[in-house]
Amino acid sequence: MKNILRKMMLVLVICSICGSLYFSNFGDPMVWLFAGHWFDPCHLCWRGRILMYPLLPVVIYALFAKDDHLSFLTAFSSFCGMFLAGYHYLIQQKTLQNVFACAPGNDCSVVDWHIGFVTIPFLELVAFVMIFALSITILIQLKRKK
């Protein structure tokens, strides 16, 4: 069961990284077909990447070494990522004020891409929540095993 959870976590991390790289290299899939518009990640997006990208080697190692204790690391990283992505999403929805200085022309509150309420930080939030839930599930199973 834990191996399936680790594989699910690996798929989530790979999809998140590929999605992140796709948006920064190609941008909106519909606009890119015609104009070649890509998105420059804001500083909050970069911090989200800093929390997401290192999860790939950690999850791969945990999968092959069958090391359940690395779920503490994935849980902590995804927990921090949940707060960061949630904060970023609330800034975009104009619910919170951005207390960080943004680069000119690369404001964190600007919604570059959306489908209804789903924006790039919302996708990041969903990924971190799912990784956190999988990590906690593995940790609960580890505790029951003892």
Give residue ranges: language-model regions.
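Secretory/periplasmic and organellar redox-cofactor proteins
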Residues: 1-44, 51-146
